[in-house]
A protein has these predicted regions:
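Generic protein-terminus/edge-of-domain signal
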Residues: 1-82
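A hydrophobic/aromatic-rich effector-binding and dimerization subdomain
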Residues: 8, 102-166
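Conserved metal-binding segment of the jelly-roll/cupin
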Residues: 83-97, 114-117
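Short hydrophobic/aromatic patch on the recognition helix
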Residues: 86, 244, 293-294, 298
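An amphipathic alpha-helical interaction segment
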Residues: 151-214
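A short, Lys/Arg-enriched amphipathic alpha-helix from helix-turn-helix/homeodomain DNA-binding modules
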Residues: 177, 199-237, 258-277
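Terminal helix-turn-helix DNA-binding modules in bacterial transcription factors
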Residues: 250-289, 311-313
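…primarily DNA-binding HTH/wHTH and HhH modules…
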Residues: 295-313
Length: 313
């Protein structure tokens, strides 16, 4: 384990970030022995000593199940978040997560599953791990479990823990990876439930998305920044791109990119019919750097060229 230290001139404090590159590194942080080189399951009651707070840069996949509401805030990247009990938080390699180091300690509670990317190599899960987009959600987009869902997740973690206890043989990694995949599939199901139960909030986001696109195309932004990207829209709505994309897909049946492209084409149709600007002027107004790119995209989406559409309408 190594520390990376950042010093803030403004606040005059040192922000230490602990690099957790391996399962062994994280075991050492908890003060426990290695059981398997690539994976571990930890239940909070196993840790009887206080743990120091610090932010951690993970080279692992980590899933936290918190049993209690946190009294303090959690820092995830640059975001601060106070989360509820029975919350699942997902961290993927390269993400920074944890409480800033201030000399305080805490008592471990809940469950934690962590595993290295090497565990997945050559497995079904390794080929599809990127399909579990919630590993890239922001922390305020965490999964909030019902009591029954919580028991399902704990049961999955116990099965993984039991396999680790059985010792390592040629089948171990495949069996453990399959058990992790089952857990992640349950998480996918539970996120679908969460999207449904938060339908009103999701509709509000969809309305704000529409308003954002309307405002974008009536401003100077297309000429300066080009056509709006999914990442830009997600950032303006204070959502991670993956969570935003999944939400739009579940609400509309279209990907966020398809939705943006549809909005561009609808705006283009209005401009073609309602004013006398040239095709090039309309292309630039929509954020296209080259008019031929606009014409090509329009024909692909609408089935005719912009000029043909104008003549028909």
């Amino acid at each position: 384990m190594k520390y990376v230290i950042f010093v803030s001139d403004k606040n005059k404090f040192m922000d230490k970030i602990l690099n957790i590159s391996t399962v062994s590194d994280y075991n050492a942080y908890w003060g426990i022995e290695d059981r398997h080189p690539l994976v571990n399951v930890l239940e909070g009651s196993q840790i009887t000593h206080p743990i120091r707070n610090c932010r951690k840069n993970f080279g692992l996949y980590v899933i936290f199940l918190k049993d209690v509401r946190c009294a303090d805030y959690l820092k995830y990247g640059r975001e601060e978040y106070d989360y509820q009990e029975n919350t699942l938080v997902f961290v993927s390699p390269g993400q920074v997560f944890g409480y800033p180091e201030d000399g305080s300690t805490y008592q471990a509670k809940g469950w934690c599953l962590y595993f290295g990317p090497d565990l997945l190599r050559g497995t079904q899960l390794g080929r599809h791990i990127k399909d579990y987009t919630f590993f890239s959600y922001n922390v305020h987009e965490a999964l909030h479990l019902s009591l029954q869902e919580r028991e399902t997740i704990i049961d999955c973690m116990k099965k993984i823990d039991e396999e680790i206890k059985n010792g390592t043989d040629k089948h171990s990694n495949t069996i453990i990876a399959s058990a992790i995949e089952l857990l992640l599939n349950y998480c996918d199901r539970f996120y679908d439930r969460q999207f449904i139960t938060r339908k009103k909030a999701n509709k509000d986001i969809l309305t704000r998305f529409e308003e954002l696109l309307d405002e974008y195309f009536t401003s100077w932004k297309p000429q300066r920044y080009g056509t709006p990207t999914v990442a830009y829209c997600a950032d303006q709505l204070h959502l991670s791109p993956n969570y935003f994309g999944d939400l739009i897909k579940k609400e509309t049946g279209k990907s966020a990119q398809e939705y943006v492209q549809g909005k561009i084409m609808d705006t283009a149709k209005d401009l073609l019919v309602l004013n006398q600007k040239s095709i090039s002027e309309i292309a630039y107004a929509l954020g296209y750097q080259y008019p031929q790119y606009f014409s090509r995209a329009f024909k692909k989406a609408v089935g005719c060229t912009p000029n043909e559409f104008r003549l028909r309408n």
